[in-house]
Amino acid sequence: MEDGVELLKLAKDRRAIVWVAQEYRYMPPVAEMIRMAHAGEVGRIHQVAIREHREPFYPKVGDWNRFSANTGGTLVEKCCHYFNLMDLILGQRPTKIYASGGQRVNHLDERYAGQTPDILDSAFVVVDYPDGARAMLDLCMYAENSVDNEHITVIGDEGKLESLLPALTLRLGKRADWGKREVWGQASGTGRGVAVRRVWDTNIRYAGQHFGASYIEHQRFAAALRSGGPAEIGLEEGLRSVATGIAAHRSIASGQAVWMADVLPEGL
């Protein structure tokens, strides 16, 4: 947190923009999901759930990503973009974090300068927001053989949006389309009236990383530089997502809920 606060101070009087690379909001089905959610397609939003079931961390220079002292921990280094996505979808700042997680499978047989890696490989994180809405992250990094590694769900009082990657699929299910329950016990998972489509942005000339999101973000960054416009993702927003990850790690260590006010400096 100290480094992030120092960056805020350094950037305060700069004329040049500082843009934090939170690219997940630009992935085509996710971008469309956010647009639809903010347009009221599912009514008032009450829950956001993000599941990532994937492969372990890749090897990196100096094996720096094997130790929490270098990265801030998996929920900071790997997952801050998910927490940023939650804030963006709900349009609020988080208030309280509950988390449970650990290192169950990955890297336990590795040694670096005689030290065993300590980064967690699985966790559940629940994030509370001021109006009572909640978000949840389900992370598992020893789940390679999945059809879709990333599943983002936005649920409102009128329906549900789902984004699936790498399938690039977006689903919209409206409660009204399901119809009136005639018999208690009648299955609600029939998919009746659920709209399903594959979403791609034809503006993406090179898919690169994150299903073209990095391409789109670089385009927007370049446009902001040329026009003198503001960064779409500023340092304060980035710092809040890091703080959520730090709070989650503190919650895991203590077994207690952690208030964001105890992590973020006053005014952020």
Predicted feature locations:
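Predominantly a Rossmann-like dinucleotide-binding segment in NAD(P)-dependent oxidoreductases
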Residues: 16-19, 24-117, 123-124, 255
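C-terminal glycine/acidic-rich active-site capping loop/insertion
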Residues: 109-116, 124, 128-129, 152-153, ...
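Hydrophobic residues in well-ordered beta-strands that form the structural core
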Residues: 18-20, 137, 163
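Rossmann-fold NAD(P)-binding glycine/threonine-rich loop
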Residues: 1-17
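Glycine-rich phosphate/pyrophosphate-binding beta-alpha loops
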Residues: 80, 138-147
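A general structural signal for well-ordered alpha-helical segments in protein cores
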Residues: 4, 27-30, 82-83, 218-219, ...
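Aromatic/hydrophobic pocket-lining residues that form π-stacking "cages" and hydrophobic walls in ligand
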Residues: 7, 33, 247
